[in-house]
Each structure stands twice: as C-alpha cells, then as structure tokens.
Amino acid sequence: MRRALLPAFVLISVLLEGCATLISEPPEQVVLPYVTNFSYSQPADGMPNGWRPWTLSRFKKATEYKLVKEDGQTVIRARASSSASGLVHPLNLNPAQYPLLHWRWKVDQLIAQADNTRKSTEDAPVRLVISFEGDLEKLEFDDRMFFDQIKAFTGQQLPYATLMYIWGNRLPRDTVLSNPHTSRIKMLVVESGRDRVGRWREEMRNVYEDFKRAFGEAPGRITAIGIMTDTDNTGENVHAYYGDIAFKKVAPPRVVFGAD
C-alpha cells in the first residue's frame, strides 16, 4: 500500500499541469513519521535524504533542485525556467497529534504573469504539497466519478485530499482556492506580493485546522509532503529556496504556580 504514495503524488501533477503521463514507480522506500531535514545533508550529497524527484511529465522540462549552503546552513535551491517538477517525501503522520507545520522559504522574485485563479497561468515560485488518507466512499458523486476516471486511465489511486501552501502574487493571504477538476485539491495562500521577496520567511500553520477550513472535515493521516517551484504555464524564470520542514505538537498550556 505504501508503494502507491509517490505515484499518487504524480497523479496530483496530472491535475496541476493537465498532463496524463506518469513516471515509473520508484523503488521501495521506508516511510517515516517525520520529515528529514535538508540541513542534515551536505551539498555534495546531491539529493537530500528521504526525498525523491517528483516528475510531472517526461514532456515537461524539470525544475532544478540543488542542495546549497545559505548563511551556513544546507537548504534546497530551486531554479525554474519554463519548467515544473518537485521533490517528494513519503510520510506516515497523524495531523491530530502533530498539527503544527513549521518551515521556511525564500523567493528571489515573483512570477509576474502568474495567476493561481486561472489554469493557463497557474504557477507558483514556492509550494508545499501535502496528501492525506481518507474514506473514498465519502466523496461527492462528481469527485468519485473523477477519481474513478483517473484510476481507470492511470491504474493509480488519487489521494483522498491534497492541501497546498503557496506564495501568490496578488491574492490576500489565507485565500483558499479549489482545483478546477476536483474539490479534493485545495490551495491556501500563505504569502502574497512583493513585500517579503528576497528574505527568508519563517512560516507556521496549523495543518489540522487549515484542512478543516478547506475541506469542511477533519483530516486523515498525512501520506506525503512535497515541494514544487513551477513556471511551465507562464514560461518565466524564478529562483527560490526551501529550508527545513517539520511537523510539531501543540505546546501544552503554561502553568503558573502561585497565580490567583
């Protein structure tokens, strides 16, 4: 069952990019209950531990991802030029126990023509993509039919739900967008505009609460997380950086002894 995680992530790319070509299934990989830090790797390692390439299509140019040193710490540098691909990390995580997602990223410039409300210009300088398990029998009729069509066409099952955190151009922060093909893929705008371009941004989101807001229900287990920088729709060039990604527990309330 766990071998289907990465192909399922590739299926998400079918919906993101309008492409129906899948990559071959990767070798067996241990599924961890945590995200392996980029900072644990060295630039000479090539690919960060625990992560694998996420190829959207053999007909699309791949974004370049490289381990580099930035301010003395190993991070991922993404360079996109009319390209779209990502890195994916399989997971087995309960978001009810570890609801807080902490990460940092940096964007050197925005994608001028990008508009995440339109399929023809739906690019983003940075994305975090999270897939979730769930009961497929609970899906709406239209979604179930769409899932069945994808499975019949590709032989693989889509994740029950997918939540993406993105950096947009103009949309207000916290805007939630739906995929035009299915209600089971949502985008949430975490950063927007030029004000914070060129600086590392520390982000913290409650994935459990964000999922409930986006999908109207509690999330199932998290099966994978990915990063993606894409400019294939706009044909532009963009550089971006990703730092460590971690799921954390909510800190217990602080007890002050002696207080009235």
Model-assigned labels for residue ranges:
Residues 7-17:
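Bacterial N-terminal signal peptides
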Residues 20-57, 141-148, 257-260:
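Extracellular carbohydrate-recognition regions
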Residues 24, 126-128, 183-193, 197-235:
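Extracellular beta-strand ligand-recognition surfaces/modules
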Residues 38, 225, 244-247:
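Extracellular beta-strand elements of beta-rich domains used
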Residues 63-85:
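Short carbohydrate-recognition loop motifs
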Residues 90-101, 194-197:
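Extracellular/lumenal carbohydrate-interaction signature centered on repeated Trp-anchored short motifs
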Residues 97-151:
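Extracellular-facing segments of soluble proteins and assemblies that are Gly/Ser/Thr-biased and enriched
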Residues 123, 133-181:
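Extracellular/luminal beta-rich ligand-recognition
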